[in-house]
Amino acid sequence: MIDSTGLKVFGEGEWKVRKHGKERRRIWRKLHLAVDSNTHEVVCADLSLNNVTDSEAFPGLIRQTHRKIRAASADGAYDTRLCHDELRRKKISALIPPRKGAGYWPGEYADRNRAVANQRLSGSNARWKWTTEYNRRSIAETAMYRMKQLLGDSLTLRDYDGQVAEAMAMVRALNRMTKAGMPESVRIA
């Protein structure tokens, strides 16, 4: 399960921006995470500048892990040849929804072309998402939410190398908390 989130380095708070508009000195970094869907552990992470797209950071993120990955789920921002090529190179099945009105790609893009065919048959990605268990991708979003709630949504160091180290320390801390035990929820009613 792969996704990214923003971490604020410095700048105004959200309320001030909404009220008075943004200032030029707002700086963010993007934290890209790959999360194991069974253990909820972050298996690899990367911090990039905010102008790096998710699909540009994807190959470096995938290359970090030495685990055997059967399938990778990501949102539509990762529906690029660059991402699909990296998954094919590592023999990982792609669970990435095609963009609206996407066309077939020639060559060996079977996973994507199946998703495009499903999209055309049903008129949306809803059926494909249900049959492929794409909804488990929310596990990555949950990991980001847990990290921001427990460890904060900003970086305190100004130096980029320091920010990378700080972000990776946050990821390690989140993994330690995850290994200590995930909360068990029980439905009441």
List each model region and its residues.
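Mobile genetic element proteins and their domesticated derivatives, centered on retroelements
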Residues: 3, 33, 40, 58, ...
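Short, flexible loop/turn motifs enriched in small residues
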Residues: 24-30
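A general structural motif
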Residues: 30, 68-69, 91
